[in-house]
Amino acid sequence: MAAPVYADTSFLVSLYIQDANSVQAVADAAKLLPLCFTALLEHELRNAIRLCVFRRQITTTQREKALHDIESDKAAGVLHAVPLDWPKALKYAEALGRRHTEALGARGMDILHVASALALKAGRFVTFDEKQRELARLAGLNV
C-alpha cells in the first residue's frame, strides 16, 4: 500500500470552495487520491468553510453544498479517515516548533499539520501555504 497523502486545509478548502487555487487543487487531487483525513483536518476544514461565509466569500447555500460534498467524499473513500497518534504528533510538533518557529514564523496549526503528516508517515504533503510548504520541506516531507 502506498504511503498516505496529507493535504492541509488550504488545499482542501480549494477542493470544496471555488477560489484561485481550485483548478490546481482538483487536478492535483485526481492524481493523489485518497487523501488522509484526520479529525484535526475535518474540524479545521469545516470551520474554514464557515469562516468563508463570515467573510462573505460564499453563501450559506454554498457552505451547505461544500459540507455535503465532504461527507460524500468521506463515504466514497476520497477522504480516508485515519486515526492520529496524538502523543507522537505532539512530540513532532514540539521538535518542529523548537527548530523552525523563530526562523520561519510558523503558526501552531501549521506545525500540527506537518507533525500529523510525519506521525502518519505521509508520502506526500500538499499545501498552498508557502510557510507551511517550507516547514514541511525542512521536516523532510515530499511537498
Regions found by a protein language model. Give the residues of each.
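Phosphate- and divalent-cation-binding pockets in alpha/beta enzyme and binding domains
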Residues: Q24, E44, Y92, E134-A136
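C-terminal binding/interaction regions
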Residues: E130, A139, V143
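Short, well-structured N-terminal submotif of metal-dependent ribonuclease cores
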Residues: M1-E44, A48-K65
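Active-site neighborhoods of divalent-metal-dependent phosphate/nucleic-acid chemistry enzymes
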Residues: L79-E134
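Active-site-proximal, substrate-binding regions of enzyme catalytic domains
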Residues: L40-R99
